[in-house]
Amino acid sequence: MEPRDLSAHTVYRAGRGIEEVARELGLDPDDMVKLASNENMFGPSPDAVEAIRGSAERMHSYPKASHADLVDELADMWDVTPEQVWLSNGGDGALDCLARAMLDPGQDVLVPSPGFAYYAMSARYHHGEVNEYTLSKADDFAQTADTVLKDYDGERIVYLTSPHNPTGAEFTTDAVRTIAEETDEQTLVVVDEAYGEFTEKPSKRPLLSDRDDVALLRTFSKAYGLAGIRLGYAVVPEDWADAYARINTPFSASELACRAGLAALDDDEHVERSVDTAAWAREYLSAELDAPTWDSAGNFILAEVGDASAIADAAQERGVIIRDCSSFGLPECIRITCGTREDTERAVSVLNEVIEEVKA
C-alpha cells in the first residue's frame, strides 16, 4: 500500500518557534525575538482573547451560530451578500476552497515567483498543474499587468499577492482590472490581500461589483493577531457564490475561531496600533539597517545582505530570528517582520553587527 505519486509536491516548512530555536541553541526563550513569520507584534486582539475564554464551556457544540454570525459581519463589512463570504480554516483553507471549486484535473494555474508556496501546493493537491510568472529583482519586484500577462497562457486560476510576500510590492486596482480583462473568460484572478490592512491602498473589492472573474483572499492571522486559531476567508462574485455549499468541509472554522474573529472585528484599537507600529518599523528598518531594502506595504521588509543564510544563522545565535529568503529563490535576501519599537531596534542593532562581521 502506497500513496499516490507525490514527487511533484513540495513540503511547506513554516518558521520555527522561539522555544524550538532556544532549545537548540541553549538560550532562554524570554531573551529571544522572533521577526521571521510576519506575526502580529502585539499578539492577539485582547477582545478576542476574552471571547475565547468566554467560549470555552461551549466547545461541545458545533459552530453553527457563530459561523453564521461571523459571515454576516464580514458581509456587512465588505458590502456583499453572506453567500459571497467563504469562511475557512486560515487563508490557506480559502485557497483550497477556490481550487476545489475551479480546478478540473490537469488544468493549469499561474503563480508568482518568488511567492507564497501554498498557491502551487494547493493546486497540486487538487490535481492541477503549475506555471509561474517572474517578479524581477532587477525591476524592484514591480507588479504590473504586463508582469503577469507576458507569462499567461490560458491558466484557469491566476494568483496575485498584494501586498506581496516577501517583497511588499503591490498591484494597483487598474492593473488587476487589466489582468482580468485580458485573460480568458474562464480564468479566475485571485487577489491575496492577507496583508491588506497594512497598506494605504484600497482593497480590490470594488472589482467584484461588476466582474465574475475576480476573488479576494483575507485572513485574521496578520493585523488581527489570530494566526494560531487559523481563520481566513475568500470574498467571491455573487454569480457563483453558491458553489461554497458544494465544496466546503463541515464546519470549516471552529467555534473558538469564529468567536475570536467576531471579537477581533470590533477591536479597532488593536488593529490601528498594529498597523501604525508596522508603518513606523518599516521606516526605521529602511533608514537604519546597513543593507539595501525595498519599499514594502506589508508588516515586513525585504533586505539584500549577501549571504542570507550566514546572516540569519548569526543573528539567531544572538537571539534575533529573521527569515532567510533562500527558500523564495532569494539566497541574498532576508525578510524582517515589523516588531515593537524595542524589538525592531534590537533587531537592527544585531543585524548591523552581523552584516559587518560576515562581510569582513
UniProtKB/Swiss-Prot annotation:
Keywords, alphabetical: Amino-acid biosynthesis, Aminotransferase, Histidine biosynthesis, Pyridoxal phosphate, Transferase
Reactions the enzyme catalyzes: L-histidinol phosphate + 2-oxoglutarate = 3-(imidazol-4-yl)-2-oxopropyl phosphate + L-glutamate
Molecular function terms from GO: histidinol-phosphate transaminase activity; pyridoxal phosphate binding
Pathway in which this enzyme or protein is active: Amino-acid biosynthesis; L-histidine biosynthesis; L-histidine from 5-phospho-alpha-D-ribose 1-diphosphate: step 7/9
Organism: Haloarcula marismortui (strain ATCC 43049 / DSM 3752 / JCM 8966 / VKM B-1809)
Family per record: Belongs to the class-II pyridoxal-phosphate-dependent aminotransferase family. Histidinol-phosphate aminotransferase subfamily.
Superkingdom to which the source organism belongs: Archaea
One Pfam family from the record: Aminotran_1_2
N6-(pyridoxal phosphate)lysine modifications at: K222
Biological process annotations from GO: L-histidine biosynthetic process
Top-tier EC class: transferase
Names of the cofactor(s): pyridoxal 5'-phosphate
Enzyme Commission identifier(s): 2.6.1.9
Protein name stated in the entry: Histidinol-phosphate aminotransferase
